[in-house]
From Swiss-Prot:
Belongs to the bacterial ribosomal protein bS21 family. This is Small ribosomal subunit protein bS21. GO terms for molecular function: structural constituent of ribosome. InterPro entries: Ribosomal_bS21, Ribosomal_bS21_CS, Ribosomal_bS21_sf. HAMAP family: Ribosomal_bS21 (MF_00358).
Length: 66
């Protein structure tokens, strides 16, 4: 779990920025969005396959251009 410890000389804006970076790096917000609603395992598999297909198409397009 992300956390930032403040000292007396620390600026709040800087600490908030550090905290936001830690939250983003830990993936807290993306996990929260993913868990907002229940998703059936079959739907999860479909999304995972679609994402893999999309990555493959992107990779193939990049290879053909470069």
């Amino acid at each position: 779990m992300p956390g930032v410890y403040l000292e007396d000389s620390d600026n709040f804006e800087i600490a908030l920025r550090r905290f936001k970076k830690q939250v983003e790096k830990a993936g807290v917000l993306s996990e929260l969005k993913k868990r907002q609603h229940y998703e059936k395992p079959s739907v999860q598999r479909k999304k995972k396959k679609a994402a893999a297909r999309k990555r493959l198409i992107k990779k193939m397009r990049k290879m053909s251009m470069g």
